[in-house]
């Protein structure tokens, strides 16, 4: 007890002395003493850890507080309490922690004294933060924006409170690994990426060939972001027989006891360590001690590990081992010191299977409504972050600071939602409900903030405007369900101004669809007067459509007025009212107005699309600009989820997609009702089978793509059979089994059906084994005809190309059996989804990325309509309020290809802003022209912000790029990229803040303003 108190006192005195000297020591700058490693013995790095899911079987709160123990015996607060106590009892012990969402809660509950003690443990290296994100994010269903944001949230906390920046990526539980995740970890400056899961065939080959560690160069565009990767030998839990917290025999080393077992237990552990060593190339092995929510009673672990280490190390000749408490960073340093040459991997780690019948490809689609809601809130968070920065000069600093504090709610809930059992859809139902509720709370908080900011912007700039009453802003979150209470005042003659916000970095000329209660309206633009509009009358509802021109990071206003209102301007243009025309009734009866064989044609200046007059199905698509044509069909099919059979008991469930057979059934054999709308703004074909299956093909007058809106679900299980629903597109393209999918919305990955670049694949599951995640983009190409067919999605899905010229997109799934991977519930979700895709068909030589990249960003960052009301004419309203706003210097201040990815306050008291700018195009070698490096002067972007300094940082904004130092590794190809090889390291540009951006590069800056 005396030693323990003295140990604590020394820590506290050390911190007090630092404070007195006025120093804020950054722990990354402190050279910790290296552990004693052996050059002749096998060094066994024991890594004490807990894997704390930020929700899974229990909610985040239940896991933290330890409630609902009947579901899972876990309480993170007790884990941290007991682990810290055990570290203080023995300075040799170490512990790593990963999930900052939990640690931040625990930290905030601690006294100042305890916080200082913990800082001392971090200083000494006993407690080390690994990975350091708000959660351990999924890699298949997360968007790259969200991944970077949640890592930033965790790293900012660690830097502000401890002065540390993690150096190792630790993703030991996600169910497959993406190229983008590896690239992000490289750009963060991580020295290594440690993973726990790898396909069973891949890992068998690697174990045999000692290739469990390699250099992962996952991107052609930014190869300097390669990262050394190490695969754990046997997942991330304690070796069998040594889980002292869960009932395995303790180490009994008292020679006076009859049941002394220290020799046999040491021999047992030695065999484990030596087996591990046969698969790795250095005399170092990492053996994790811990598992899910481990160290709830940390003393049970540490006391026994102490004995194991002491006994084995006292007998080096007998056991041949050097055991030590270690961390992943210590282990990686030791591997690096071996100075070996490493193989290079360039493909990703999808799909993942843990045996021949179990491909983890179902979760790419599980809970698609939640996946869509997460994506929607990502877009909203970026809107509110942008607004808070660009409007802060218009409001009192105290008000601006409060609004920035308010948005932390949304940042944190979005950080939680990226967890690998959250957006992935692999949680229990009550946990999914909890995530949705948290997102809803964050959503409401964000909309309240936007209401305040937009009110400020509307009344800014000019005395007359500033004297106007601040309007109240409302929103219509159910626009995709044709519900918008904000437009109800039109029925009583009140006009409805609609402010439409664009969060992208270029002017957008896009269609807007708004449900309205009446048909006879006009639309007036704040900048262009009365404009053409269209009202579609469908099943008794009215949908207003018009083309809106919106400046970057800003809004434009369009005022909707009833033609019967007293506020109609004399020269206003009434909306064109269009009644949908029934072409085919539900029973398949053909309307006499249409010849049986004549196709239905939707056409604009860019594309021509033909549909069957029998059932409204798509027949062909022609790109009128390049003159290329392909026949194309689309059908809904479903796979019968396995409930186990003689080959394997494996069921299809939350994680696993395992169909009973590779044959897929037509989802609905009935002929749908088909209706058509033709208008100046849009024309569409609507196919209605039932309220559970509706498909609309929509062609806008200014679009080079075809939009597809689909309503699917709840999935019918009245026959007692679950269903996994796929939308299959079949073209005449000859694709040679090759197709492409994005990686978390970023770089495209080449896929070849029934093939893996890294090993010789034995095909056992030809359907589920070929599905990979798609977050935004999938396409097929016919090089001989120079044709490309692209599908752009609004949320993550699973995709495959099982036949030449085909793309299969899994849309929704509902299974009736648990798949045995821990969640303990079937994927029996009864939700309906409303989802939007874009179909793009073009000549490869027409620089394909310029078509699909902006289209994908448009879906991921949709325009945001904001509504208010007025009892004024549009002219009077425009004279009082700022109807058009952009904080940028022009309609296109950024060169084509550059995008402001992040614009958010770091500290608005110090006027410091986190700014990320990305080049959205990649080097892929497929286009006739690859993107070039783009130059930008940061000082020319903003009109409302004057940049006084710009310091380039690592990706999460906590470490100067000029100070970033990574371990050097040798590779078999000799390409040992410098992390800064394509990046300027100048902190403050003396030439107008000029920087260059190579293809697919994201550069991060902390800028200060006046």
Swiss-Prot record:
Q: How does it assemble?
A: Tetramer of equimolar amounts of 60 and 58 kDa subunits.
Q: Which UniProt keywords apply?
A: Disulfide bond, Glycoprotein, Glycosidase, Hydrolase, Lysosome, Metal-binding, Signal, Zinc, Zymogen
Which residues make up the annotated site Cleavage? 507-508, 589-590, 593-594
Positions annotated as pro-peptide in this chain are 23-40, 508-595
Spell out the reaction equation it catalyses: Hydrolysis of terminal, non-reducing alpha-D-mannose residues in alpha-D-mannosides
Please report the name of this protein according to its UniProt entry: Lysosomal alpha-mannosidase
Q: Name one GO cellular component term.
A: early phagosome
Which amino acids does the record list as binding Zn(2+)? 51, 53, 173, 420
Using the UniProt annotation, give the residues that carry a glycan (glycosylation sites): 68, 480, 520, 528, 539, 623, 760, 784, 828, 954, 963
Protein source organism: Dictyostelium discoideum (Social amoeba)
Q: Which gene encodes it?
A: manA
A single Gene Ontology MF term assigned here is:
carbohydrate binding
Query: What's the PTM story here?
Result: First cleaved into the mature 58 kDa subunit and an intermediate 82 kDa subunit. The latter is then cleaved to its mature 60 kDa subunit form. These events occur in multiple intracellular compartments. The 60 kDa subunit may form one or more intramolecular disulfide bonds.
* SMART domains registered for this protein in UniProt: Alpha-mann_mid
Organism taxonomic ancestry: Eukaryota, Amoebozoa, Evosea, Eumycetozoa, Dictyostelia
Q: How is the cofactor bound?
A: Binds 1 zinc ion per subunit.
